[in-house]
């Protein structure tokens, strides 16, 4: 086989192998995301999280927007922050790479959502983005709520 044909053969082999590896990695990554989502079912299917999503999307519908989609990874981030606020007593934004609404003190999803609706900046957060995550924590009578949007 002449040198040019050998180089062409090697180049084509590498190209095909690279595509196969990339395809396998992509499938593997999709499978990993699916497994992680299933691991978070306890959170995203929780009645309080579902109620927060319902109230959030009712407000979006009221102003003519499509519903936000519940994102399991964002729910986990919001949940971790709500737990942190409840454990530390600090009422502070998390610095996550999302728009974020937090609330401390009110005892129901309705009260937290209404507080966000009545605050212009928080309301604007609710109306932006397509994905949303929620978290909440009650500890020693302290209620902490967190929503993140992107």
Language-model regions: role of each:
Residues 65, 99, 129-131:
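Extracellular structured ligand-interaction cores
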Residues 30-86:
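A short alpha-helix/helix-coil micro-patch that ends at or immediately precedes a cysteine
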Residues 2-9:
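Bacterial N-terminal signal peptides that target proteins for export
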Residues 17-25:
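C-terminal segment of classical bacterial N-terminal signal peptides
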Residues 104, 109-150:
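Disulfide-stabilized extracellular recognition modules
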Residues 72-113, 126:
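Short, surface-exposed glycine/acidic/tryptophan-bearing loops
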Residues 26, 45-47, 51-54, 96-108, ...:
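Secreted/periplasmic proteins
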Residues 10-18:
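Bacterial N-terminal signal peptides
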